């Protein structure tokens, strides 16, 4: 039944949901990649859709910006609508010089300055990691599509406008591939409620070089990432 944030019914969502931050990007994904699309959520403008990809039922819905927002939506999808797998498809900023604009990053794990997982885990560090099979399927899908995806750690930041520039040096030293704002929270929610999750990001800007894509480009040109996510779902069905 409907929740305070999702006005859908059980069965409206597929067992796999792709989740960009921007609800308009969710609309673009649904209209571009799915067939037989119908809207299943519009509360607070957080658009959600269900359709089919090569005959496979798949949903896509926005999750908003930051860990608090995405945690609400992912929790409700899992506990109230029976969702089993969540794939965040978003953008990230690069800190390493060998990571380029529009590179695809598969988030094997997620560091964070947020305390949400410590709250969950009795103030201990929680290893926020993606589901192994989902990572493997995404890697295999990228190879099949001829996309040279990077695999490694993301950093989920609470502040978009961070005052601590030195932290980027630390991230680079530790091999962090990209900075975003949600993966660690989504991995924590999935672990808490027995679901599986993965984050795939496209590099939208470079923190060192100050290169960046436009908002319109973020909405329409990150197709490689979406294709990887969708094809990885089909690979997962074969397991």
From Swiss-Prot:
UniProt EC number: 2.4.2.1
GO biological process: purine nucleoside catabolic process
The protein's name in its UniProt record: Purine nucleoside phosphorylase DeoD-type
General function of this protein: Catalyzes the reversible phosphorolytic breakdown of the N-glycosidic bond in the beta-(deoxy)ribonucleoside molecules, with the formation of the corresponding free purine bases and pentose-1-phosphate. Acts on 6-amino and 6-oxopurines including deoxyinosine, deoxyguanosine, deoxyadenosine, adenosine, guanosine, and inosine.
Family, per entry: Belongs to the PNP/UDP phosphorylase family.
Binding residues for a purine D-ribonucleoside: 5, 180-182, 204-205
Coiled coil, from the record: none
Catalytic activity: a purine D-ribonucleoside + phosphate = a purine nucleobase + alpha-D-ribose 1-phosphate; a purine 2'-deoxy-D-ribonucleoside + phosphate = a purine nucleobase + 2-deoxy-alpha-D-ribose 1-phosphate; inosine + phosphate = alpha-D-ribose 1-phosphate + hypoxanthine; adenosine + phosphate = alpha-D-ribose 1-phosphate + adenine
This protein's GO CC annotations: cytosol
UniProt-annotated catalytic positions: 205 (proton donor)
InterPro entries, per the entry: DeoD-type, Nucleoside_phosphorylase_CS, Nucleoside_phosphorylase_d, Nucleoside_phosphorylase_sf
Site entry: Important for catalytic activity: 218
Cell membrane recorded as keyword: no
Pfam families linked to this entry: PNP_UDP_1 (PF01048)
Subunit (UniProt): Homohexamer; trimer of homodimers.
Name of the top EC class for this enzyme: transferase
Source organism of this protein record: Salmonella typhimurium (strain LT2 / SGSC1412 / ATCC 700720)
GO molecular function: guanosine phosphorylase activity; purine-nucleoside phosphorylase activity
CDD domains: PNP_EcPNPI-like
Entry superkingdom: Bacteria
Protein residues bound to phosphate: 21, 25, 44, 88-91
Record-linked HAMAP family: Pur_nucleosid_phosp
Swiss-Prot/TrEMBL keywords: Glycosyltransferase, Transferase
